[in-house]
Design a protein with these regions (language model features):
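Nucleic-acid substrate recognition interfaces
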Residues: 1-385
Length: 385
């Protein structure tokens, strides 16, 4: 499986100037190549390279390999756009978003990331330095900082290109690593995981990961955003963007911790992980006006992604099951009714009297559905006589 390792660069002022000039030149060249691809409706990388290669080198001061990387970046951007249109991510054929996306060439920000392959970038992991091509010449002994685990991953699994990124006044390199996947084991049982807003995750083992602190953190950021939005200045706009990224990083960190704990328990006990199939839930449920921001910021899909990739690295099977009525069905007598859940937190079966936390009951139902689904999937096909 492919993973990325992000290391922080520690450049000197002279190196910063060279990196900034290189990033600006590459993205200006990408803007030019994007206009050519749009005006001539070019889809092939080889065809666009024939049209733009010499102009990109001469007009923007790029060497041969960076010019090739710029052309590939443009072609990949248009390929991604066409895939998004086919998937319906930009709406129907004449929708405003789709018409806007198709009516102009793709633009590249001055500080957009730029890929470098091994001909333009070399790593010296023991010295924790890199050597990178710039428009001012080769910059050597560019120091970087990373954890020992990241260094081990880079040394063992780094492959392909790395991206140069500038974000929030800091420089980063994002390296692609091809990590081998262990074989998925046969689960002895399953851990059901119910995802929610008040409780971000609740397992059938009674482990509860509450979301109150994350909600308070989001409300605090919302108040700060409102104060900055009133000012309507450029500095306020910059601070708003920084705060948005900080809030997203915090939510990602919380999801990483939850996923790590759940996968560790599953790997240690030899069990699989069962999750609800929640794709499209925002289209099916229309919340009240004062609940829309809370539901829109609910990071349930990101938590599913984190659990899935961490489970793949550990060889733990992951199964998605039907989410309907998991918190309204009694796991003992299978009686299903909305009245079985009188409050958000409490479940009480009207038929057999089983009572308990509603999220735990939902997690147990998810676990039971995974047991049945896994048995059906692994039943051998009948032999033809």
């Amino acid at each position: 499986m492919k993973l990325v390792v992000r290391v922080k660069l520690l450049p000197t002022p002279v190196q910063v100037a060279a990196l900034a000039a290189t990033l600006h030149a590459c993205n200006e060249a990408a803007e030019y190549a994007s206009r050519v691809a749009f005006e001539r409706n070019v889809k092939s990388r080889n065809e666009l390279q024939k049209l733009c290669y010499h102009d990109v080198k001469d007009r923007f001061g790029l060497s041969a390999q960076p010019a090739v990387r710029v052309v590939k970046k443009v072609v990949d951007a248009y390929t991604t756009l066409r895939a998004s249109i086919r998937a319906g991510n930009l709406g129907a054929e004449k929708s405003r978003r789709r018409v806007k996306a198709e009516s102009k060439p793709i633009s590249f920000r001055r500080w957009a990331a730029q890929p470098f392959d091994d001909r333009c970038l070399s790593w010296r992991l023991d010295a924790r330095t890199v050597s990178i091509w710039t428009t001012a010449g080769r910059v050597k002994d560019l120091r970087f900082a990373c954890s020992p685990e990241q260094l081990t991953t880079l040394r063992a699994h780094r492959q392909g290109e790395s991206d140069l990124l500038f974000c929030d006044g800091m420089w980063f390199l994002i390296a692609t690593c091809e990590v081998p996947e262990p074989e998925v084991f046969e689960p002895a049982d399953w851990i059901g995981v119910d995802r929610g807003i008040t409780n971000l995750a609740t397992t059938s083992d009674l482990d509860n990961f509450q979301g109150r602190r994350l909600q308070r953190y989001r409300r605090w950021h919302a108040r700060k955003r409102a104060e900055l939005q009133v000012r309507r200045t450029k500095s306020a706009h910059r601070r708003l963007k920084k705060r948005a990224r900080r809030e997203a990083r915090h939510a990602t960190h919380v999801n990483h911790k939850i996923a790590k704990d759940i996968v560790a328990v599953a790997a240690r006990t030899g069990r699989g992980i069962a999750l609800e199939e929640l794709h499209g839930i925002r289209d099916r449920v229309r919340p009240h006006r004062h609940q829309r921001a809370t539901q829109s910021s609910w990071p349930f899909h990101q938590l599913e992604q984190h659990i899935t990739y961490k489970a793949r690295r550990a060889g733990v099977p992951v199964l998605l099951v039907d989410a309907r009525y998991t918190s309204q069905m009694c796991p003992r007598c299978k009686h299903t009714s909305r009245s079985d859940r009188p409050t958000r937190d409490r479940f009480c079966c009207r038929r057999c009297g089983l009572a308990g936390p509603a999220d735990v009951v939902a997690a147990v139902n998810i676990r039971d559905r995974a047991r049945r689904a896994w048995v059906l999937v692994n039943v051998p096909l009948p032999t033809v006589a």
